[in-house]
Amino acid sequence: MFMVNLLLLIIPALIAMAFLTLTERKILGYMQFRKGPNIVGPYGMLQPIADAMKLFMKEPLLPTTSASTLYMTAPTLALSIALLMWSPLPMPHPLINFNLGLLFMLATSSLAVYSILWSGWASNSNYALIGALRAVAQTISYEVTLAIILLSTLLMSGSFNLQSLITTQEHSWLLLPSWPMAMMWFTSTLAETNRAPFDLTEGESELVSGFNIEYAAGSFALFFMAEYMNIIMMNALTTTIFLAMPYNMASSELYTMNFMTKTLLLTTLFLWIRTAYPRFRYDQLMHLLWKKFLPLTLALCMWYISMPALTSGIPPQT
């Protein structure tokens, strides 16, 4: 039964990821006054299937100077970690109900750094290595902000369990009392997933394509899939933390539809930001985190710690 539930989670997530690529190309097209993909199938709806067939049917390439084991392992690890992060997410029922679900998701997102670092080093290319080092520095830096924001929300819910976060929002979204943190969280998720305007890892003018420059065919597709799975997952987590709908046993379908709609809107916002904003310089990226976000999140965290003491109250205990 567990395997059936696992497949029922993974297959729809992969289908959603495939059509997210089509959605992005359509949004980019319309923002640039063109149609986007419209040849394969009605309105281009079969384009993701054609892309997948092309990528997975091509001959895989292995650079002669690369570290072959790490080179082949890195894309598989990237996608595996991206799929693993879905397991504790309540939609409305999680695949695995962890008491420390939020901590697990934060730790798992940190593991994604290893796949990027391995791919950059194993490719034996200067462009790939510099792109990988940029990605690692950027991801680890923004995880500091993400961790502090998560700590602040945990102080409001009183538990690391994602279900208790939903219960906390029974009367109002956490977005309302903590909107500055929500804005910083959303910006940090953009940087965490290496998306524009923070896609410094694949700055075409400097690094050609970044850490995946030596990858082609199926291995490139696995990195591509992992990136888009992480985008959907991060927006699903944002929905759970800040925009959750109270879960009622009689309305699980309604909860799922509500959850999917909010996640889709946030994901569309990710894509719209890519069309609207130019890429940051690397020093601006780090300046934004260490000199703007970090002091603000620390101050807000101290505020949420001190408020219960000042009002002689404690967070709900679960």
Curated annotation (Swiss-Prot):
UniProt-listed GO biological process terms: mitochondrial electron transport, NADH to ubiquinone; mitochondrial respiratory chain complex I assembly
Keyword check for Membrane: yes
Subcellular location, record wording: Mitochondrion inner membrane
Regions that span the bilayer: 2-22, 76-96, 98-118, 140-160, 171-191, 217-237, 253-273, 294-314
Keyword set, alphabetical order: Electron transport, Membrane, Mitochondrion, Mitochondrion inner membrane, NAD, Respiratory chain, Translocase, Transmembrane, Transmembrane helix, Transport, Ubiquinone
Membrane topology: Multi-pass membrane protein
Catalytic activity annotation: a ubiquinone + NADH + 5 H(+)(in) = a ubiquinol + NAD(+) + 4 H(+)(out)
Cellular component GO terms held in the UniProt record: mitochondrial inner membrane
Signal peptide positions (record): none
Matching PROSITE patterns: COMPLEX1_ND1_1, COMPLEX1_ND1_2
EC number: 7.1.1.2
Major subcellular site: mitochondrion
EC main group: translocase
GO molecular function: NADH dehydrogenase (ubiquinone) activity
Family statement: Belongs to the complex I subunit 1 family.
Assembly mode: Core subunit of respiratory chain NADH dehydrogenase (Complex I) which is composed of 45 different subunits.
Alphabetized HAMAP family for the sequence: NDH1_NuoH
Function: Core subunit of the mitochondrial membrane respiratory chain NADH dehydrogenase (Complex I) which catalyzes electron transfer from NADH through the respiratory chain, using ubiquinone as an electron acceptor. Essential for the catalytic activity and assembly of complex I.
Protein name: NADH-ubiquinone oxidoreductase chain 1
Organism this protein belongs to: Ateles paniscus
